Amino acid sequence: MAVKTYKPYTPSRRFMSNLSSSDITGKASVKSLLIKLPVSAGRNNNGRITSRHKEGGAKKFYRIIDFKRNKFNIQGKVAAIEYDPYRNCRIALIHYVDGEKRYIIQPSGLKVGDVVFSASSGLDIKTGFAMKLKSMPIGTIVHNIEMHPGAGGALARSAGTSAQIMGREGKYIILRMPSGEMRYILEECMATIGVVGNEDFANISIGKAGRNRHRGIRPQTRGSAMNPVDHPHGGGEGKTGSSGHPVSPWGTPAKGFKTRKKKASDKLIISRKKK
């Protein structure tokens, strides 16, 4: 998919780029698979800001995606490739032979007219097919991976991402995650074969503030531009550097400080992600 640039007829357009929509074939979304999500805009039930730099953004409908891929042994055909405003990859509309329609994340290379299947075992290693990890050979590239059997895919779902099966050990499969982390996943978990499409998403440049406002992202004020009451970096006469190490507004170190809580699932991580 090509990255589209624009003529610099305004300064904001000079470095702006976007993805070509030539791969989108769907004319209209399936209404039964659309819902309207409430917009919190970073506020809690008291109306107070709990997550900064968020707003409503452009109006959009959420597409109900089949992350579980649990329609076993029924053939489906790709009817359309569509844009999804809630994610950075494309989605594929699947028409099953029994009449049901579902959306799935579009793997790279999946096009209109292709056939997809889901089964617990016994399928060919083909892009878009979904099965349990225990049925896939070592070296298979997968995405939309479950962390708990039957819970639906949670790992490797964004544009251009994938994981690779590196080995087996007892009831676990060893996966190399997109970050480089090596971890165990139960062999009963489902996954979809292939790499998530829209790989060029990482190459686009937002270019102007208005596009981020449409995405629901508000401007971020530097701590050094605030008063001491508002931020540890605030205050001083004129432009002054902060004393000590950079911290968040609440005093947590901002550079390299680990904030991840310990979990029981830490034992399933073989090696941490690459530095």
UniProtKB/Swiss-Prot annotation:
Function: One of the primary rRNA binding proteins. Required for association of the 30S and 50S subunits to form the 70S ribosome, for tRNA binding and peptide bond formation. It has been suggested to have peptidyltransferase activity; this is somewhat controversial. Makes several contacts with the 16S rRNA in the 70S ribosome.
Keyword ATP-binding belongs to the record: no
Biological processes, Gene Ontology terms: cytoplasmic translation
Pfam families named among the record's database cross-references: Ribosomal_L2, Ribosomal_L2_C
Database matches in InterPro entries: NA-bd_OB-fold (IPR012340), Rib_uL2_dom2 (IPR014722), Ribosomal_uL2 (IPR002171), Ribosomal_uL2_bac/org-type (IPR005880), Ribosomal_uL2_C (IPR022669), Ribosomal_uL2_CS (IPR022671), Ribosomal_uL2_dom3 (IPR014726), Ribosomal_uL2_RNA-bd_dom (IPR022666)
Database matches in HAMAP family: Ribosomal_uL2_B
Key words, A-Z: Ribonucleoprotein, Ribosomal protein, RNA-binding, rRNA-binding
Entry's Gene Ontology cellular component terms: large ribosomal subunit
Gene Ontology MF annotations: rRNA binding; structural constituent of ribosome; transferase activity
Entry protein name: Large ribosomal subunit protein uL2
Stated family: Belongs to the universal ribosomal protein uL2 family.
Annotated Basic residues bias: 257-275
Lineage: Bacteria, Pseudomonadati, Campylobacterota, Epsilonproteobacteria, Campylobacterales
Residue span of region Disordered: 210-275
Listed PANTHER family: LARGE RIBOSOMAL SUBUNIT PROTEIN UL2M, RIBOSOMAL PROTEIN L2
Subunit: Part of the 50S ribosomal subunit. Forms a bridge to the 30S subunit in the 70S ribosome.
